């Protein structure tokens, strides 16, 4: 039995009706304390429980070494509060953000909901973050970097769409020396008009501005929505080639509701008592988790085939099991990210997936990892 999945999760979210965002922030505060105090005993215990290292899992991409292909997706640790802890939880890389040039509070609460019938979540966070300068300072203080760190960039809510390039550029200028790769997020459904920036004529000036500034040739990717039509994806792939992008992150959350079992969004209320509900069709926000799995894999496969496998893909969306992970890798993903599945399954999900992937992987002759007993803090990406 999975104690977290089968006991703790139902108690928190179904029984006590805890606010998912409050639970997440409580966990982040705890991880931040571990990070800030360098609680070596706790970090060592986490490593023993959740780290699984095997040379067959290593991935070499963009001049970086990923100890394994499983990363934490953007949105969980937006401000890099626990950068020193994620390696001890087994992740092969972490993506922070979405970051905007200035701090912003995001959308009104409540803005994060669990949909257990669908093993999904609905969020309308709205890029709440402490701003690029705060993240830059945190990254400068980071003493060790055992796994690559990606930075997800976004537009502020108050910035007009026609000035979006300036926002992405401002954050990139502050952070370009501190991130290992960068992701242009133009696909969140929770910032008004943002998805329109996926159109070629709107995306082109953003990519042009960033690549002109990108003198150190940091890997630059675009994160796309699962709801795009194939011709729209083709246009983005043409831009990716024209602007020498390093890859695509596929995909963000979906606006579709037609395949959900959940009909009403759970309301807040007294624990273990009936609560008010609201029709989910009337609720704004993007859906992540299991309902996204099939479509995100379709998009990965389409990109892989359209580019003859020449454009690396970070696959994200609906990964809960080894079969889910293998499906995306076989579709053409080079790396994987998890978020909602990790929230549902718990921290034991990472080593479980990695063990399965190692059994399914051929040897990786071009990458050598440190011995299995090397402390994670001594591994340099």
Swiss-Prot record:
GO terms under cellular component: cytoplasm; plasma membrane
EC number: 1.3.5.2
Gene3D superfamilies reported for this sequence: Aldolase class I
Pfam families on file: DHO_dh (PF01180)
The protein's annotated pathway: Pyrimidine metabolism; UMP biosynthesis via de novo pathway; orotate from (S)-dihydroorotate (quinone route): step 1/1
Family annotation (InterPro entries): Aldolase_TIM, DHO_dehydrogenase, Dihydroorotate_DH_2, Dihydroorotate_DH_cat, Dihydroorotate_DH_CS
Gene Ontology terms, MF aspect: dihydroorotate dehydrogenase (quinone) activity
Annotated positions binding FMN: 74-78, 98, 152, 185, 223, 251, 289, 318, 339-340
Superkingdom as given in the UniProt entry: Bacteria
Keyword Membrane: yes
Region (Disordered): 359-381
Annotated localization: Cell membrane
Main location as per UniProt: membrane
HAMAP family cross-referenced by the UniProt entry: DHO_dh_type2 (MF_00225)
PANTHER family: DIHYDROOROTATE DEHYDROGENASE (QUINONE), MITOCHONDRIAL, DIHYDROOROTATE DEHYDROGENASE (QUINONE), MITOCHONDRIAL-RELATED
Family: Belongs to the dihydroorotate dehydrogenase family. Type 2 subfamily.
Function: Catalyzes the conversion of dihydroorotate to orotate with quinone as electron acceptor.
Name this protein carries in UniProt: Dihydroorotate dehydrogenase (quinone)
Biological source species: Synechococcus sp. (strain JA-2-3B'a(2-13))
Gene responsible for this protein: pyrD
């Amino acid at each position: 039995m999975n104690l977290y999945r089968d006991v703790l999760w139902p108690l928190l979210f179904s029984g006590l009706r805890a606010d998912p965002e409050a639970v997440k922030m409580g966990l982040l505060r705890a991880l931040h304390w571990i990070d800030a105090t360098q609680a070596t005993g706790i970090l060592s215990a986490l490593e023993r429980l959740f780290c699984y290292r095997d040379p067959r899992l290593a991935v070499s991409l963009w001049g970086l070494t990923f100890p394994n292909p499983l990363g934490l997706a953007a949105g969980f640790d937006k401000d890099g509060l626990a950068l020193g802890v994620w390696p001890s939880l087994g992740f092969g890389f972490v993506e922070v953000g979405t970051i905007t040039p200035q701090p912003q509070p995001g959308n009104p609460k409540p803005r994060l909901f669990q949909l257990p019938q669908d093993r999904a979540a609905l969020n309308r966070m709205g890029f709440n973050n402490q701003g690029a300068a705060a993240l830059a300072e945190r990254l400068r203080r980071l003493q060790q970097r055992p796994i690559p760190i990606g930075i997800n960039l976004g537009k502020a809510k108050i910035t007009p769409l026609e000035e979006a390039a300036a926002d992405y550029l401002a954050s990139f200028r502050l952070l370009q020396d501190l991130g290992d790769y960068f992701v242009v997020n133009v696909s969140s459904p929770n910032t008004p008009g943002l998805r329109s920036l996926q159109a070629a004529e709107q995306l082109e000036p953003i990519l042009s501005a960033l690549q002109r500034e990108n003198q150190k040739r940091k890997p630059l990717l675009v994160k796309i929505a699962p709801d795009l039509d194939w011709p729209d994806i083709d246009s983005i792939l043409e831009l990716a080639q024209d602007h020498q992008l390093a890859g695509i992150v596929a995909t963000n959350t979906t606006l579709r509701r037609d395949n959900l079992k959940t009909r009403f969004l759970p309301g807040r209320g007294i624990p273990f008592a009936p609560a008010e509900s609201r029709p989910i069709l009337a609720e704004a926000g993007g859906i992540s988790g299991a309902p996204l799995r099939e479509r995100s894999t379709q998009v990965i496969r389409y990109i892989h085939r359209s580019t003859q496998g020449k454009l690396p893909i970070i696959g994200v969306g609906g990964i809960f099991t080894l079969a889910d992970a293998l499906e995306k890798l076989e579709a053409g993903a080079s790396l994987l990210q998890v978020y909602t599945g990790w929230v549902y399954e718990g921290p034991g999900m990472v080593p479980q997936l990695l063990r399965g992937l190692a059994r399914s992987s051929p040897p990786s002759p071009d990458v050598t990892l440190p011995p299995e007993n090397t402390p994670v803090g001594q591994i340099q990406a």
